[in-house]
Design a protein with these regions (language model features):
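NAD(P)-dependent short-chain dehydrogenase/reductase
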Residues: 162-218, 224-229
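N-terminal Rossmann NAD(P)H-binding glycine-rich loop of SDR-like oxidoreductase domains
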Residues: 7-28
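NAD(P)H-binding glycine-rich loop region in Rossmannoid oxidoreductase-like domains
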Residues: 60-100
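Glycine-rich NAD(P)-binding loop of the Rossmann-fold in SDR/ketoreductase-type enzymes
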Residues: 61, 92, 96-107, 144, ...
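Conserved Rossmann-fold NAD(P)-dependent oxidoreductase catalytic core, especially the SDR/UDP-sugar
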Residues: 79-81, 106-148
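Amphipathic terminal alpha-helices
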Residues: 6, 279-281, 293-302, 307-325
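Mid/C-terminal beta-alpha module of Rossmann-like enzyme folds, strongest
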Residues: 202, 230-285, 289
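Active-site Tyr-X1-5-Lys
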Residues: 132-134, 145-173
Length: 325
């Protein structure tokens, strides 16, 4: 006898994380996955049960459209609120960022609480909530002081998630992603996009511009595989895993410099690939990048059962393996 069907809604599903998460969820024939974005998403090519995918094209900033998407997916096992304007585009257009990343997300969270009180929600936040003045090492106990529009929007929604969870309106967690490397596909309008591009583009015979010349610039990174595994784990966490009014958790990442990535590229892909990496300084992007925290202590999320990658070389090898499929 077939099991009871579980419904999962993923917004921002035309990006990287949404399709990868959907593919993982679709390993189970009892999972029905609803994918929605401004542009109609595609069925993940590796989906084991593609018949269980529902594709919904919608502008979630339109209240009526958003409500129709939610209604189609009810009753929900979990909703993954992943839609938003990325860091570089947010800084270039703060009004749009506020409309999408704050107003649109807020409306959806409140509507989910209204139509299915206590539903599990996973909100995608970011390490960009941290900004100057930064301590030597950042933990969940560090007070976020975002110095960019993107981080500001994410932190505002984290606070709303905290309060909705505290009041029992949602059963929610906010996950602060490190930079996911290597992202497949085309470059995104994120300031950190080059951290994937520096591997992805040369491995595909394309030049990659670097927005800063400092090869020792460090960032916190994780692979798509680890990000998806941690999403699945946190989706199944009990409600009391974190205090009711403190629902944000940092997803584990590794600390790697630009040089670490270049060294891994040369080792895995060949020294000739380095010639495709070009310095093209971008002061606006560099300012955003240098405002973010990179030295984070991940002992708490690891103790709670999340996982991390080993090193930069592992990130590159994982991506190269996908090119051979």
């Amino acid at each position: 006898m077939a099991g009871q069907k579980r419904h999962y809604l993923i917004t921002g599903a035309a990006g990287l994380v949404g399709p990868a998460l959907a593919e993982r969820l679709l390993e189970d024939p009892d999972n029905i996955v609803f994918l929605t974005d401004l542009i109609k998403p595609s069925i993940p090519p590796g989906a084991k049960h593609p018949e269980n995918v529902r594709l919904l094209e919608a502008d979630l900033c339109d209240q009526s459209a958003m409500e129709k998407v939610v209604a189609a997916a009810l009753p929900l096992t979990a909703a993954f609120v992943f839609h938003g304007i990325m860091s570089g585009a947010s800084e270039a257009n703060p009004a749009l960022a506020m409309k999408v990343n704050v107003d649109g997300v807020r409306s959806m969270l409140l509507h989910l609480a209204k139509v299915q009180r206590g539903v599990r929600v996973i909100f995608s936040s970011s390490n960009a909530v941290y900004g100057a003045p930064l301590p030597e090492v950042v933990t969940e106990a560090t007070t976020p002081t975002p110095t960019g529009v993107y981080g500001c929007c994410k932190y505002m929604m984290e606070i709303l998630v905290n309060d909705l969870n505290r009041r029992g309106e949602l059963d929610a967690y906010s996950v602060r992603f490190p930079t996911i490397v290597v992202r497949p596909g085309k470059p995104s309008p994120a300031a950190s996009a080059f951290l994937s591009g520096v591997i992805r583009e040369p491995m595909n015979g394309i030049e990659c511009p670097l927005p800063l010349t400092d090869r020792q610039f460090k960032a916190t990174l994780c692979s798509p595989r680890v990000a998806i595994e941690n999403l699945v784990r946190i989706t199944n966490w009990p409600s009391d895993k974190l205090p009711p009014h403190q629902r944000a958790i940092n997803f584990p990442g590794i600390i790697a410099s630009v040089q670490d990535l270049l060294d891994a590229l040369a080792k895995v892909g060949g020294e000739d690939k380095l010639a495709l990496v070009k310095d093209e300084p971008n002061a606006a992007y560099e300012a955003i990048l240098r405002s973010w925290a990179w030295s984070l202590d991940y002992s708490k999320p690891l103790e709670l059962g999340l996982i991390g990658d080993e090193n930069a070389e592992g990130l590159v090898r994982e991506y190269v393996a996908t090119l051979k499929k």
